[in-house]
Amino acid sequence: MVRKYVVAPHGGRRAYPDISSALRAAAERRGPALIEIAPGHYEESLTVRGEVQLTGLGGPGSVVVSPPRGTVLDAFGTVRVRGLLLVGRDADVVDCLGGSLTLEHTEVRAHGGVCVHARRASLVTLTDSVFRYGRTLFAGAGGSIERCGFHDAADNALAVIEGARVSVRDSRFEGSRIHGVRVSDAWAELVGCALTGTEKAAVMADTRAELTMSGCRVDSVHAEAVMFIEQSRGLVRGLRVSDAEHGIGVASGADPVVRDSVFADCRDTGINVQTTGRGTFEDCEVVDAGSVSVFSTNGGAPRVNGCRVTGGNVGVAVVDKARGHFTGVVVEDLSGVALRVFDESRAVFEQTRVERCPAGLEVRGNGGTTAQLTDVRITGFDMAAVAVTGEARVTLTRVSAEHGLLGFGVGEEASLRVQDCDVSATRAGGAVAFGRARLVARNLTVTGSEAFGLCGTESAYVDVADSRFEDCAAAGVTFDESGGGRLVNCSVTGARGMGVQHNGRVDLVSLHTSLPVVERVPEPAPPAVQVVNHHYHGPVFNAAVHGVQLAWNNDEVTQRIIEPAPARATPGTTPRATPGADRRTIQELDDQNGATP
């Protein structure tokens, strides 16, 4: 039988003046107790033991329990709290030492402390409640949270650590100084939750955590919406992210599965996998990412299947010794390159479609940089569908490029292998090799190029067999400068341009064409022009010179004539000039850089 106790601030008939006195009375009688609390402000700390229910009478916030310092509610047993406002400072406002604790329609405010601390082996249920300023901590405990709000936490709004297991449904987290939810070496499930305004990752899984998210929304956060690190695992389904720095981040050995999620208007990246992180991303969409939509870097290795990238700058980037496997990816309407592989990275693209992007695939790096494309279609590009430079190695199988500037280009010391590929309706050419690059093609078809079909220039080597070049405006095949190679069983058809224009460094084996084949041996370079430099630093004399004054490099010359004073005549004599003293000419040369010998 449940005994009922009534608490009123000023006492009354059969009423207790404070909550603590009612708790003492219930403890003395033992058994289940229901304590009904009238509206008022109670400055006391509550210690609850046994099976007790505390219920506030009146509207929300009418029953306030707020001691000056310390814990507000210390619970051990089977405790239920309903309709109270608990306010504490510099301590755990609610501390569940063991047993079970349920908070319903309750508000907890922690000024400088923890809202709720669920300790090991306890079970805490939070329903229709609000938690402000402090974090809610499950340390080795079990818990369930439904329809709760977590506001303006000074650190993490909800922390699930040390093997705890917590399920969170239909709750909201906003304004946390660190994370909205942190799961560390524990298990947590978030269903239908909303997170906003966090200063770090809205949801963080670290230290081998297990995190499941379904139907959640994250917006307006300063860092990642969701972050998996340190070998954490989990499943994320139906996540909607907007206005985050990064949509989802994976690092340091973490390996989540992410499905059916949308990352929109991320300021930097949509999907970011780094530092040996992995992850499987299926049927996701990245919209208008500020920098890179899907980013694998520094040893990252994601698997991306059936995803769509729309708008933004760069579509998929695999850089800095990273890897990536991409299947069924659609990339469209970007302002930058669609696919990028740099710096000792390795990427595989299968059944991928690129539309309306300035460039298709861009590969650059040393010999450890590789890309493989199979069943890929690239259309509507402004530059090259495929561009390979450095020492990178790329293999194309059943790749089509249409309606752009250049189909396939390989330069410097890179290598490009082409098998069963098509290039059509390009403005500058079908395929080109330059520098000291190597292009090997089998069953390549180039149609409707406004310039050439195939070009080898500088010192490139081109090996093409069983290929067709149709209706190319300038030439089907052209070799310039020192470029060389061979054409085996190839055909050049059309009604315009030349069939083959070469430099004598290419082997033509079984060439089929009705168009002209022209050999143009490069003219030898003209001899070097002899350059004679004359240096005029002073006068040059070709014979003896006497009685001259010389000056050079002068900016100003001043000449002054000084007349001697007339001699006085004595009576009876006639004045006469003194020889050599009639007139004296003095030249003064005024130049800081001048010289007068």
Model feature map: region roles:
Residues 1-28:
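Right-handed parallel beta-helix/beta-solenoid
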